[in-house]
């Protein structure tokens, strides 16, 4: 192990040791306060709302210290989904969101947010061919994003140790309330781990959970699925489809899949209902709550962002 990576490991270990053992009484007091705070909220959402009502009803919002894995095959809308939630948390609820984009540049990522916020298609924004009215719409609606507490880091090939150091600084300086990583398999665990990808991914997922606990914020990490999902008739993902490491499932407090049947030519369900424009969020693991499925509306023309299917005013 190189000196830099060894020092990072020692620093992490030292940080964990410094946390004192506590007696149960003050912990109970803290737990009771949390229960009382949840009881006082009329919507029953104890965590940070995603903005999707049906999803929040199942999850009760994103909880501090939770590691949430959002997985899907390519082009299913993983980035669109988390960007939709990031926009809602930052613009609507004024919570600081940190996004680490290892796949797209910061400008590409923000262009997606602009498309969603302005309701101007990605194609129009790409070509710049806007009418005078659309230019006015762009400048008028973009103000909400300009003022939003969204932080973007597009450092490529980021190591888990660099991520942890950056997140500590962001928590101290901006008070970030949620961390988003796009996506897990593009991270590294240092030079010593290269060549053993399964062990590397295991270390990364374990450290992401540690970051969530250390900073007391939800950490949402996108993940790829293997091709096994495409061998099934219904094409629905399962926990066994998580790519490269079973430790991802083990470390996660929640595992969610994004499933778009129409991508596989499945346009109606067993009851004859249309599946066009539908994205199903499958909650396959939920350590502290229920599992199940939630249907959301998919808007491909707005850079594949997800909208709720059951409430017109829930635009994210």
Residue ranges and their predicted role:
Residues 1-5, 307-316:
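Conserved small/polar residues in nucleotide/adenosyl-binding loops
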Residues 75:
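Walker A (P-loop) phosphate-binding loop of P-loop NTPases
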Residues 78:
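Conserved lysine of the Walker
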Residues 81:
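Hydrophobic positions on the alpha1 helix immediately C-terminal to the Walker A/P-loop
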């Amino acid at each position: 192990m190189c000196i830099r990576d060894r020092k990072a490991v020692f620093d992490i270990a030292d940080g964990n040791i410094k946390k004192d053992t506590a007696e149960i009484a003050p912990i109970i007091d803290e737990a009771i306060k949390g229960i009382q705070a949840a009881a006082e909220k009329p919507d029953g959402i104890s965590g940070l709302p995603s903005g999707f009502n049906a999803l929040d009803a199942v999850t009760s919002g994103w909880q501090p210290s939770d590691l949430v894995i959002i997985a899907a095959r390519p082009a299913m809308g993983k980035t669109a989904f988390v960007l939709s939630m990031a926009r809602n948390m930052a613009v609507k609820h004024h919570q600081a969101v940190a996004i680490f984009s290892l796949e797209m540049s910061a400008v590409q990522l923000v262009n997606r947010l602009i498309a969603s916020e302005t309701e101007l298609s990605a194609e129009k924004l790409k070509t710049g061919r806007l009418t005078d009215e659309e230019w006015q719409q762009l400048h008028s609606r973009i103000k909400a994003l300009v003022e939003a507490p969204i932080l973007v880091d597009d450092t490529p090939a980021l190591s888990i140790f660099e991520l942890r150091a950056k997140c500590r600084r962001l928590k101290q300086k901006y008070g970030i309330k949620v961390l988003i990583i796009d996506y897990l398999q593009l991270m590294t665990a240092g030079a010593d781990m290269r060549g053993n990808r399964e062990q590397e991914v295991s270390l990364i997922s374990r450290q992401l959970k540690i970051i969530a606990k250390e900073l007391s914020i939800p950490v949402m990490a996108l993940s790829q699925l293997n091709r096994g999902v495409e061998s099934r008739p219904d094409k629905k993902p399962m926990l066994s489809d998580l790519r490269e490491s079973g430790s991802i499932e083990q470390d996660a407090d929640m595992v969610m899949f994004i499933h778009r049947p129409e991508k596989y030519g499945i346009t109606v369900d067993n009851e004859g209902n249309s599946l066009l424009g539908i994205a199903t969020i499958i909650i396959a693991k939920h350590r502290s709550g229920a599992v199940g499925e939630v249907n959301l509306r998919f808007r491909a023309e707005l850079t594949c962002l997800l909208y709720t299917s059951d409430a017109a005013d829930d635009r994210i």
